[in-house]
Amino acid sequence: MLALKLMQNRTRYQHQGSTPETLTKILQDDTNLAVWQRQLPLHISDFAQLLLSLNEPLAESLCLELPKEDAEPDLTGLASGFRDLEGYEGFVADLKWLVSAFACLLGAKRIGLRLRVLDKAMCPRFHVDHVPVRLITTYAGVGSQWLKEGTMDRQQLGQANAEPQAQIQQLNSGDVALLKGEKWHGNEGFGLIHRSPQPATGERRLILTLDWLG
């Protein structure tokens, strides 16, 4: 019985589903990835594609304070250079919903938000995050890549020749993923192994990340 318990404690699972309730799986001790496989509303995906088509830079960060459970995140001025594009208000409304859902699920009072347009892999080698949990969603472009538990020797993280190319999993555009990191209590040594994808030449991606800061 003790051996079985020890084996269970050293196993991590990844869950994917078509409803937002799937994200609650991240709270389970034996889970280090939960993915809501969502289909983006057309007005949001159209906005994201239009934004990318302008070939303008975007790299914005916010530290959001949410002192009360029902506090609405203040995203005033976020991506304001694109406010005249059709679909901007719906896009910001979606960002607010994700921030609120993230805060509600984790009981977070402070959240770090990053919204970026990328034309290259920000973190091209497989790695783990030294945070409790991170939300990642790609609004347009290729999604982040990850590995199932046991696919790669963690001692070889960062070494390109050790990466199992045939076993790489990939998120789709629109998917909302919660990635458990090394600083989640009890998850030390089991942060999800993942990396940024390399966009094709001339392609870009619009990505949102949320970090639980407190």
Model-flagged regions — what are they?
Residues 44-46, 146-148, 180, 187-188:
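Short helix/loop capping segments that flank catalytic or ligand/cofactor-binding pockets
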Residues 164-214:
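Catalytic core of Fe(II)/2-oxoglutarate
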Residues 30-33, 132-135, 174, 204-205:
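Short, surface-exposed beta-edge/turn micro-motifs
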